[in-house]
Amino acid sequence: MDLQRTNQDTGTTTLFKVVISNTVNYLPKGVWILRNNTIDSLSIAKQFREIKNNINISHLSRENYWVETPFGKVFHSEVVSEEFMQIFIDKGNKALNNEEMIFACMSEKGWNVSLETVPNLDIPVGSYETQLGLPVGLHPKLHVHLKNLHKPEDECSLQGFMYIPPTLFIDRYELSNIAEMHADNLGHVLGIWGETDLEAPSYKLNGTGSFFWFDIYTDDGLLQKDYIDTIIPLHTRYQSPLKGQTYLKTSLTNPKFFWNCDTEDKVNDFRFLFSSKNKYTLQNDPTTLSISIPIADLSYKHVVEWVTNGVAIFSFFYLLLYLWKRFRYAKD
């Protein structure tokens, strides 16, 4: 589907996509909605309610659960209910398999729904593997091994897009410095949107997470080697204490890597990720990585309070005693 033509013909104000497979798309698996900044979230939620009652996409109608980008506001949910998908499958009048995705446009005239199939490419464009560097610790490093790389067209650039869950964050300043030096083969940082506060704990945020879009540095020498390795540094956020637990497991979905061969618009527009053009997507297993984040155990809350207060009181009287002795010796 030609994205620009669709917008022009139907007056579309909202783009909507459900990705059920992590192997054939620019976007990771989940519900993705992109809307114009002039539309409010309540209007979007109303449109979904009119399709069928009791559609439960958490936080859809709340403005602070939409991530603002220069190209519009984005809603993302990793959870896709079967009921939610079935509505749009019915509107597309076709069964959906694992190599397809739902693509829908909402305009004043209603919904225009289609089911997209990404064709098998005659040109092998590459694949990739990911793993977390050991030890994982509080500052995990995502190691990416891109291999069997073949640039489909001369003007194509190798790009990656990933969703960062609210339990983790990336440091835009750290990444900018890495990209400036082309360290770890990281090229330009095309965009970081969402919850990017470097100090805020998870319980102080809305829980939308963040999106990271970036270039991989390539040259003829690297492509001749047939593989490129890169490292994406991540950081864990402070979590709320839980009773009986000392670790909180969080999931990190694999990033998506693809060749961006869109020469019509040199501006890296988020809407490109919703289009069906140039599906030169690198293949990988749709695995999810697990990270264990240390947290405080509420079972020991009272013990910690008593010990902390005891140390503070002891330190206070120790300092008083020390000062009194100094004063006494000075007087003598």
Curated annotation (Swiss-Prot):
Lumenal side: 1-301
Pathway: Glycolipid biosynthesis; glycosylphosphatidylinositol-anchor biosynthesis
Signal peptide: none
Gene Ontology MF: a single term: enzyme regulator activity
BP term (GO), one: GPI anchor biosynthetic process
CC annotations in GO: endoplasmic reticulum membrane; glycosylphosphatidylinositol-mannosyltransferase I complex
Primary role: Required for proper folding and/or the stability of a subset of proteins in the endoplasmic reticulum. Component of glycosylphosphatidylinositol-mannosyltransferase 1 which transfers the first of the 4 mannoses in the GPI-anchor precursors during GPI-anchor biosynthesis. Probably acts by stabilizing the mannosyltransferase gpi14.
Protein name: Protein pbn1
Species, as recorded: Schizosaccharomyces pombe (strain 972 / ATCC 24843)
